[in-house]
Amino acid sequence: MTDARRRCAPVVTLALLALAGTVTTIGHEFTYDDRPVVFENDRVHALSHLPRLFMETYWPPKYGGDGYRPVVTSLFTVQWVAAHGAPWLFHLVNILLAVATVLAVYWCALAFLPRFGALVAGALFAVHPVHVEVTGNVVGQAELIVALCLAIAVGLHVRRRAARALAGRDVCAITALFAVALLTKEHAVVLPPLLLAAEATVIRGDDWRTRVRVLRPLFLAFTAVILAYLYVRGLVQQDLAGFLPFPAFRFLRMSAANRVGTMMNEMPRIAQLILFPTHLSADYSPADVRIAEGPALSQLPGLFICVATIVLMIALRQRAPVASFGLAWITIAFLPVSNLLVPTGFITAERTLFFPSVGAVLMAGALAEHLRSHAARALRRLAAVALALLLVAGLARTIDRQRIWKDNDTFFLALIRDAPNGYRAHYLNGRQAAMHGRLVEMEREYRHAIRIFPYDAGMTMWVADAYTRAGLWAPAATLFEWTFGVEPESGQGRYEYVYCLAKLGRWHDVRREALAALPFVPARDVRLMRAAVAEANRVLAGGTR
């Protein structure tokens, strides 16, 4: 085999693996978050709106107005216009981005691994089943773009530093990749610490003074990008985190200690999803998730995993620098979405493990290279068989898993099968049933969700609103009352609550609740509340209605 073919063969192999795992999505619809973010979002349906996307939130205002991701929303706009709103182009872009990201991971790994180890890393990344939530979902384009940009940036940095030739054009290229990634999704902020981890592990030879001198221009550029990003984002959103915390964190008024304890309960599951996913789900919520109420023995395995990761990362730094860097990659990439620093809008989400999993496959590539170079022949054969089985199993699981993202009906049925004990699975399935007019199924699913976890005020508000629209005043009023007990300062749904009370003839309650709601309701509802108070006073005074 010529040298050119030897270089091309891994690229073709990896591209085919990535295609095999994603090509079946080409006929899928807009599913789950795709619908509010793309399909129902008029802001991404016209090219004339493109400039304004850089001053608007990612999620539409009616869905909370969270996030700031103008690059990916701009990309959605171009795709929508080009395909006249058809989903096939969005999924084609997903497929192409998935292939490009796999090749970028391989190219990045080649910067510090021989070709065989890098090929193993790229192949395992191509067939990793936990990636399906990203590759099968249109909104996963944000994760794909970030991983693509950051893998290229790390690979370029390591190559240029190894050659002792980090020039101005390299600084510009890496900074541009960072800026694009950061404007695509906020977790791209991990690039600077990732490069520092590379300096501490796979980049050898320079003393710390030399490193500071060489890296100063790059990190000054990073600082400028981050400050500019925070300034513009601050004009759009006031909250630094950018998203409302997960309902369990928010409505239970969970302390930081209990939030960390909850994540320690989740850490074994997260480690398994990254290293060897045996069970996948699009949602992880109570009671599938164990909520911490103070220190508990159940948190010890998660604590052990965290401590062991740090200890191994330090211990392997000299003996196995690539493995050490892989552990650092997992840690750094996962930290912003871990709920350990700040609460996020989820407890565990498979899409957030896409970029951290690069570190896991780098470790696997380092192990494969070590076995190829140092193990006995019998052990090498055994490892080759195990790798082949792992690739086949991963690809088969990935292809099978892609089916659940075909459309919303398929997705929500699969969600119930995957997370039968999760309250959000039943809540979301109830919402889907309501959209199709299946009211008996809707009520059954809503009641099941509330029995599992009644402290999600957003969910109980939604159910109360559904009851109101169906004319079921008594159960609606009961749920509104519960909702405002959980979230007493909420202004949403106050008028609907007062309306239900009026329908039930509870005029004393109408007057009390309308007056109590005045500090919380939006300005447009103040007049309605005052009218309700006046009507209650008239009825209670003996007037006819």
Model-derived features: where do they sit?
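Alpha-helical linker/edge segments of TPR/alpha-solenoid repeat scaffolds
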Residues: 471, 503-512, 534-545
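Alpha-helical, heptad-rich or low-complexity scaffold/stalk segments
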Residues: 496-499, 528
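Short coil turns that delineate tetratricopeptide repeat
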Residues: 420, 454, 488, 522-523
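TPR/TPR-like (Sel1-like) alpha-helical repeat modules
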Residues: 499-502, 507-524
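Extended amphipathic alpha-helical coiled-coil/heptad-repeat regions
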Residues: 530-532
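Conserved structural position within tetratricopeptide repeats
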Residues: 417, 448-451, 481-485, 519
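Polytopic membrane enzymes that build or remodel cell-surface glycoconjugates and lipids
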Residues: 1-458, 465-469, 473, 496, ...
